[in-house]
Amino acid sequence: MFRRPVVQVLRQFVRHESEVASSLVLERSLNRVQLLGRVGQDPVMRQVEGKNPDTIFSLATNEMWRSGENETYQMGDVSQKTTWHRISVFRPGLRDVAYQYVKKGSRIYVEGKVDYGEYTDKNNVRRQATTIIADNIIFLSDQIKEKP
């Protein structure tokens, strides 16, 4: 009774059908990143031979905390750690908007996924790179406002 609908569902989720489709365990996974920070450099449009162009820029996120001896940490020193993220935009419409409107110092929100890759540098050394592949960018403000 339920076998036919189950097989149909499995075929929708599994790209390569096999004879053991009925023994497959269907599980979901999630690769999702949300970043809120400031742009560290103006974006660069890059075209790698044989691949679609992409827009690349860096985004800084800050983690701040108070440390001190008292329990509430109200009077302690403020510490900050800045983490830099490499953002790549491949989607054609979003790629062009990011290239045109993302500017150094802009505060933006980025949604995307983490991608780990390897490349060979100009000295023929293999390097690993972590990149955030952006699916959505929300512009929150212009560049940092000058204080009077």
From Swiss-Prot:
Single biological process term from Gene Ontology: protein homotetramerization
Transit peptide endpoints, chain numbering: 1-16
Gene Ontology MF, one: enzyme activator activity
N6-succinyllysine modifications at: 122
Location within or outside the cell: Mitochondrion; Mitochondrion matrix, Mitochondrion nucleoid
Top-level taxon of the source organism: Eukaryota
Residues recorded as bearing Phosphoserine in the entry: 67, 79
Residues annotated with N6-acetyllysine modification: 113
Domain SSB: residue ranges: 30-141
UniProt KW Transit peptide keyword: yes
Keywords, in A-Z order: Acetylation, DNA replication, DNA-binding, Mitochondrion, Mitochondrion nucleoid, Phosphoprotein, Transit peptide
NCBIfam families xref list: ssb
Function recorded in the entry: Binds preferentially and cooperatively to pyrimidine rich single-stranded DNA (ss-DNA). In vitro, required to maintain the copy number of mitochondrial DNA (mtDNA) and plays a crucial role during mtDNA replication by stimulating the activity of the replisome components POLG and TWNK at the replication fork. Promotes the activity of the gamma complex polymerase POLG, largely by organizing the template DNA and eliminating secondary structures to favor ss-DNA conformations that facilitate POLG activity. In addition it is able to promote the 5'-3' unwinding activity of the mtDNA helicase TWNK.
PANTHER family assigned: SINGLE-STRANDED DNA-BINDING PROTEIN (PTHR10302), SINGLE-STRANDED DNA-BINDING PROTEIN, MITOCHONDRIAL (PTHR10302:SF0)
Name this polypeptide is given: Single-stranded DNA-binding protein, mitochondrial
Organism whose genome encodes this protein: Bos taurus (Bovine)
Gene: SSBP1
